[in-house]
């Protein structure tokens, strides 16, 4: 049986304010089991801010965020992230972009090539690997962004507005 901290994400009394405006106010939740979870709320409710704090992209003002019993820091977690704002390099070939992101995540070249081919086949984007991103539909660009998020086999994948632009 796995220990309690094997898959434990905990946010406890987390808050964030931007220039006097409260973006996240004392949010608490925990996830103890693998699965698909969602943050629901209206526009401006703080979902993206919560995600960015959880990933260590922005600092929280107060509270605790832990993964497997350790305080979350951008450098000490193996998370994948698909941001709401899509970011592909329009003139760069998809394969080159994938290699770049794999390198950023510390993957060995052979492992990166294997992962790129595996995920391109799985997501049905093999034919686009040698094309620049600007030639792809928004939906296929989003699939490429998803590949970037999972290429390094992260322990946790966080998706922000994951289905916008997909069929």
What are these regions (language model features)?
Residues 85, 91-104:
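Q-loop/switch helix immediately C-terminal to the Walker
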Residues 146:
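Hydrophobic anchor residue at the start of the ABC signature
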Residues 151-155:
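A short, proline-enriched helix->beta-strand linker immediately N-terminal to the Walker B motif
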């Amino acid at each position: 049986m796995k220990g309690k901290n094997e898959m434990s994400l905990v946010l406890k009394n987390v808050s964030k304010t931007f220039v006097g405006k409260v973006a996240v106010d004392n949010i608490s939740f925990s996830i103890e089991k693998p699965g698909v979870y969602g943050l629901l709320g209206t526009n401006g409710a703080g979902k993206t801010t919560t995600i960015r704090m959880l990933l260590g992209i922005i600092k929280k003002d107060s509270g605790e965020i832990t993964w497997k019993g350790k305080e979350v820091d951008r450098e000490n977690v193996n998370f994948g992230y698909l941001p709401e704002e899509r970011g592909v390099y329009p003139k760069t070939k998809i394969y080159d972009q994938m290699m770049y992101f794999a390198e950023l995540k510390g993957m060995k070249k052979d492992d990166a090539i294997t992962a790129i081919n595996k995920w391109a086949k799985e997501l049905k984007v093999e034919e686009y690997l040698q094309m620049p991103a600007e030639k792809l539909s928004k939906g296929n660009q989003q699939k490429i962004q998803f590949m970037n998020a999972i290429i390094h086999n992260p322990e946790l994948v966080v998706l922000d507005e994951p289905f916008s632009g997909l069929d």
